[in-house]
Amino acid sequence: MRLWFCLSFFIVLCLEHFPETLADERNVPESEEKTEQYLRDLPKINRKGPRPPGFSPFRGKFHSQSLRDLPKINRKGPRPPGFSPFRGKFHSQSLRDLPKINRKGPRPPGFSPFRGKFHSQSLRDLPKINRKGPRPPGFSPFRGKFHSQSLRDLPKINRKGPRPPGFSPFRGKFHSQSLRDLPKINRKGPRPPGFSPFRGKFHSQSHV
């Protein structure tokens, strides 16, 4: 009993004489450490002055890290397309790479004014498509995208004229991508071994 009492008394004395070691580690919560490390990467923010857009003084951090890369946004003035003043962030990060879109004017193909984003990101790489004029093969005006991305690499195909072997005008794509690497096959002439004129492809890819 005497040894136990002496040990406990010695520990209490150590804590009183060295308060900067164990006492400070117990008093610092984990949440404050995380917020301090997070704010160290940001410029100094005056809590009483104007704050950057999306910054919450209660949490001590930004609502969205994407706002750190954007210029300062005037909440009372015009906002970039797809920006929500309530959440303080964009509906879609893909809009950051697009030019400003006038919601009342003509919009790029496949852009939805309700969702504030494109139906398909593949449309961003395509030139502007006139919905009332001729459309590229395989393009659906209802979905605002291509039925098959493989058609983007092919030259424009005339649906009323001769089509490449294996191309289906109904599906707007090839029955087999392996035919793209083969020379044009004359269906009425001699065919390579293993080629089926009905399926428009080889029975076995090993023949290629």
UniProtKB/Swiss-Prot annotation:
Keyword Signal: yes
Name of one Pfam family that matches: Bradykinin
Basic and acidic residues biased stretches: 27-44
Subcellular location: Secreted
Ranges for region Disordered: 27-208
Keyword terms: Amphibian defense peptide, G-protein coupled receptor impairing toxin, Repeat, Secreted, Signal, Toxin, Vasoactive, Vasodilator
GO cellular component, one term: extracellular region
Keyword presence, Flavoprotein: no
GO terms under biological process: defense response; positive regulation of smooth muscle contraction; vasodilation
Tissue specificity remark: Expressed by the skin glands.
GO MF term set: hormone activity; toxin activity
Domain of life the protein comes from: Eukaryota
Main location: secreted
Endpoints of the signal sequence: 1-23
Function: In vitro, produces constriction of guinea pig ileum smooth muscle. May target bradykinin receptors (BDKRB).
Protein family per UniProt: Belongs to the bradykinin-related peptide family.
Protein name: Kininogen-1b
Organism of provenance: Bombina maxima
Classification lineage: Eukaryota, Metazoa, Chordata, Craniata, Vertebrata
